């Protein structure tokens, strides 16, 4: 077996040998019974993992984290809605930009790099910038 470099980035992520082996097989059709059952099982397991009620609908997003962030913004905010983003680095900056692209008035509260965002600062900023999200 050939050694490959260890990924130490936010994504894509390392996968187990079993998952890699599954990828080595033929690509199933989107209506294949085995794929439908695997999808149903994954949704069931997600509900159990998150202790979600039966009526909750989890989603498997076959895309990047940015796609999931964009989906959340598209479904949670509209033009003129206000949102407060706690700035913790690159991905929170990206979330604020995505919210703005969906028309939201996104405010940020941050701290110096390497420092935590103070809870009091979040409270103060949320009082100044009352937000729907």
How would you label these PLM feature ranges?
Residues 4-62:
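A glycine-/small-polar-enriched, mobile loop at the entrance of the PLP active site in fold-type I
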Residues 39, 62, 66, 115-119:
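A conditional alpha-helix N-cap/helix-loop micro-motif detector
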Residues 42, 46, 72, 122-126:
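Generic hydrophobic alpha-helical segments
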Residues 44, 55-88, 92-96:
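Conserved beta-loop-alpha segment that forms the PLP phosphate-binding cup at the N-terminus of a helix
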Residues 85-125:
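Gly/Ser-rich phosphate-binding catalytic loop and adjacent alpha/beta segment
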Residues 127-133:
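Residue-level detector of conserved catalytic or cofactor/ligand-binding positions
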